[in-house]
Amino acid sequence: MWGPPTSAFLARVRAQQVGGVILLGNGWRSEAATEAAVRSVQAAACLHGLPLLVAVDQEGGTVRRLPWAEPALAAAHMTTTAKARAEAAAAAGALREAGISVDLAPVADVATPPASFEGTRSFGSDPARVAPLVAAFVHGLTSGGVAATAKHFPGLGSATASTDDRPVTIGRGKAFLTARLAPFQAAVSAGAELVMMASASYPALDPSGTPALLSHPIVTDLLRGTLGFGGVVVTDALDTPALRSQPDVPGRAVAAGVDLLLYAHEGPAELGFSQLVRDAKASAAIRADLAASAQRLDALEAWLAAHGGPVCNP
């Protein structure tokens, strides 16, 4: 959502075509208006007894959708674990007050200077230094009852352009990329409930050149297998130029092991929903993947409810 929900969007929520919402853009400058928007979508969802996931990019610094909430500091300026944890804990308190249950943070990418486009969004350029800071940020969020999301797996720190603008290939070797998985492993060990997949391609990890969020070797074999992540996997935005040439994106993402499909705009989201329904009707394998995803999402909802998150009152 880029602002208060439209009647058409609320109708889709009531029709159970939406599993969650993300607050995007700069339309959330009023805390009261943000809380009202969240209440309205939850009221629509609770007609069927199950609250929506409500997420926001609240990293700090330049990526801070809620200007009235912490963290004000960018990740690069959270130079100690105590500071990272305190900033995240303060953010969790503000998000909870607004009814927001998921922070799409921290960025676990290891910046590779001088050309990394991420700038101050990354905690730094040394995996051994970034890992404990990421873990501390995760602890700060989860201690406040907000689910943390490590992103953008398997790492965008060496990208020289944003995947929001065009397709990106990370041409680094396997040893280089593997060494920079330490912050993601730290996030998993610290209890991150979600991991967000990058839309870049990593030929050293998947020689087919398939974007990471569509890659079974990267999502299932590497993230779930090697790193042992059993939580919810969410895509980066699917309606970006980076994926414009990719066919059958929703079904391929689910087949790769993804649980949540994220879109920045309602039109592409509606189309993606229709495509996934079509694919599920045609494929028993997709239906099995969706059933496994539903179990992981149920576990996330249970974690949120146990930590004071949104519930639907009977």
Annotate each PLM feature.
Residues T81-A84, P114-V134:
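Active-site cleft segment of glycoside hydrolase catalytic domains centered on the general acid/base Glu
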Residues M1-V54, G60-R65:
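N-terminal hydrophobic targeting/anchoring segments and the immediately downstream early-domain regions
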Residues A86, A90, P132, A136, ...:
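A non-catalytic, amphipathic alpha-helix used as a structural packing/dimerization or gating element
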